[in-house]
From Swiss-Prot:
The gene is rnhA. It is an enzyme of class 3 (hydrolase). It comes from the Bacteria. One of its GO terms (biological process) is DNA replication, removal of RNA primer. Keywords: Cytoplasm, Endonuclease, Hydrolase, Magnesium, Metal-binding, Nuclease. One of its GO terms (molecular function) is nucleic acid binding. This is Ribonuclease H. Endonuclease that specifically degrades the RNA of RNA-DNA hybrids. Pfam families: RNase_H.
């Protein structure tokens, strides 16, 4: 049985950093498209970037080949440059022995990366890439919403 191939486009936004934030993803598979987004009252841009990837991958109910497009060097580098593996190996400490930021989200992301075959593609933000621009609009709309829930994992 062959694995489904999915295109996932993700973005995170924060109005202030920290401040109200939003995340968004657009997924495409076999000619169909799905948009998803959410937000939090107080969070950071990096948390929203990671969460967008988590939510996109979590939507997939079976192992898939995923071409994931992000404008976040932070997320891409954490995976591709093996920072994530190093942090786990070092007891969630950075190379200078400080606690890894956003550990709660990295721990949610890892099993999804193990399940799917994810290929990261970096796109320049705000450069006219249609899907990245769409995700940006969705994420900013969420960040601007009233009555957002707290980001319980955020620590100042």
């Amino acid at each position: 049985m062959t694995m489904k191939n999915v295109q996932a486009f993700t973005d995170g936004s924060c109005l202030g950093n920290p401040g109200p934030g939003g995340w968004a993803a657009v997924l495409r598979c076999n000619g169909s498209e799905r948009e998803l987004s959410g937000g939090f009252a107080l969070t950071t841009n990096n948390r929203m970037e990671i969460l967008a990837v988590i939510e996109a991958l979590a939507l997939l109910k079976e192992p898939c080949g995923v071409d994931l497009y992000t404008d976040s060097q932070y997320v891409r580098n954490a995976v591709e440059k093996k920072w994530l593996a190093g942090w786990r190996r070092n007891g969630w400490k950075t190379s200078d022995k400080k606690p890894v930021k956003n550990r709660d989200l990295w721990e949610r992301l890892q099993p999804l990366l193990d399940l799917h075959q994810v290929r990261f593609h970096w796109v320049r933000g705000h450069s006219g890439h249609p899907e990245n621009e769409r995700c940006d609009v969705l994420a900013r709309t969420q960040a601007s919403s009233r009555g957002l829930p707290p980001d319980t994992g955020y620590r100042e």
